[in-house]
Curated annotation (Swiss-Prot):
<keyword id="KW-0238">DNA-binding</keyword>
<dbReference type="GO" id="GO:0030527">
    <property type="term" value="F:structural constituent of chromatin"/>
</dbReference>
<dbReference type="GO" id="GO:0006310">
    <property type="term" value="P:DNA recombination"/>
</dbReference>
<dbReference type="InterPro" id="IPR010992">
    <property type="entry name" value="IHF-like_DNA-bd_dom_sf"/>
</dbReference>
<comment type="function">
    <text>This protein is one of the two subunits of integration host factor, a specific DNA-binding protein that functions in genetic recombination as well as in transcriptional and translational control.</text>
</comment>
<feature type="region of interest" description="Disordered">
    <location>
        <begin position="49"/>
        <end position="71"/>
    </location>
</feature>
<dbReference type="GO" id="GO:0005829">
    <property type="term" value="C:cytosol"/>
</dbReference>
<keyword id="KW-0810">Translation regulation</keyword>
<dbReference type="GO" id="GO:0006417">
    <property type="term" value="P:regulation of translation"/>
</dbReference>
<dbReference type="GO" id="GO:0006355">
    <property type="term" value="P:regulation of DNA-templated transcription"/>
</dbReference>
<dbReference type="GO" id="GO:0003677">
    <property type="term" value="F:DNA binding"/>
</dbReference>
<dbReference type="InterPro" id="IPR020816">
    <property type="entry name" value="Histone-like_DNA-bd_CS"/>
</dbReference>
<protein>
    <recommendedName>
        <fullName>Integration host factor subunit alpha</fullName>
    </recommendedName>
</protein>
<keyword id="KW-0804">Transcription</keyword>
<dbReference type="InterPro" id="IPR005684">
    <property type="entry name" value="IHF_alpha"/>
</dbReference>
<comment type="similarity">
    <text>Belongs to the bacterial histone-like protein family.</text>
</comment>
<dbReference type="Pfam" id="PF00216">
    <property type="entry name" value="Bac_DNA_binding"/>
</dbReference>
Length: 98
């Protein structure tokens, strides 16, 4: 099961007493700020959580799996996430819920 933006909004509504609309707007604004920073080529550092970085991948040769034809895979920019040490430790020591 995955945590969704709607569930995050619901948690903010329950824990902080925000209105449902304000909670939804807060979650949307948070992710919009991360998107904006990455679109501008900036690194996003969330203390105690991790870093979002941009990485440029070079063009490379590829192959169409159906036809076997060689095709170039174009150069592109990708987003990577590196978890921080605190997050790694908490995940490692967490007991999964069923």
């Amino acid at each position: 099961m995955a945590l969704t933006k709607a569930e995050m909004s619901e948690h903010l509504f329950e824990k902080l007493g925000l209105s449902k609309r304000d909670a939804k707007d807060l979650v949307e604004l948070f992710f919009e700020e991360i998107r904006r920073a990455l679109e501008n080529g900036e690194q996003v550092k969330l203390s105690g959580f991790g870093n979002f970085d941009l990485r440029d991948k070079n063009q490379r040769p590829g192959r169409n799996p159906k036809t076997g034809e060689d095709i170039p895979i174009t150069a592109r920019r990708v987003v990577t996430f590196r978890p921080g040490q605190k997050l790694k430790c908490r995940v490692e020591n967490a007991t999964p819920k069923d």
